């Protein structure tokens, strides 16, 4: 099981949920999901995503979760062209949404479940983004790219992300920094 896999260190209950309706119903949904996960014997951290439903941030913060997850696309997504220019000012700081207004977020683990400087081919963005994550207090960040080698040359899976060791080696190495 995933719970027994030593390489699986946590889980996120729902990727980019778009909640609607009464807050009490959303709180109940989150509680039931957490209960279901933990009833399997899962004892690793449980995260919940807040990127797409900011008006429900208070409900998520009050939930019995170990951490909150966010996304970051500071240059946007799918420009359908390579962006030119200096985008470092876009990644100078990651301000955690709700970090100041919801104290319940402060003591929870924080992860960025997906990020990228979409459509930027330069290798300078990832080290700057990593610095912004560390400064903001994130413990974990996952870059978003998933082209298999057979199609990696053409970046077919999600055209805004182009990262692999074979065809964008300087970007790939910068991700390690």
Language model features with spans:
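Active-site groove signature of glycoside hydrolases
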Residues: 1-24, 112
């Amino acid at each position: 099981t995933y719970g027994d896999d030593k390489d699986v260190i946590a889980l996120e209950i729902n990727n980019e949920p778009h909640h609607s309706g009464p807050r009490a119903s959303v709180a109940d949904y989150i509680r039931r999901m957490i209960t279901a996960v933990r009833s399997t014997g899962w004892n690793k951290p449980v995260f919940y995503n807040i990127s797409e439903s900011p008006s429900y941030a208070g409900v998520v913060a009050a939930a019995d979760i170990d951490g909150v997850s966010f996304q970051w696309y500071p240059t946007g997504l799918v420009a359908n062209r390579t962006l030119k220019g200096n985008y470092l000012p876009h990644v100078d700081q990651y301000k955690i949404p709700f970090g100041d207004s919801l104290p319940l977020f402060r003591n929870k683990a924080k992860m960025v479940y997906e990020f990228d400087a979409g459509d930027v081919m330069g290798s300078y963005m990832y080290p700057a983004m990593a610095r912004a994550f560390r400064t903001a207090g994130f413990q974990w960040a996952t870059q978003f790219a998933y082209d298999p080698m057979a199609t990696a040359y053409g970046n077919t899976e999600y055209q805004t992300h182009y990262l692999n060791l074979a065809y964008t080696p300087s970007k790939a190495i910068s991700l390690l920094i």
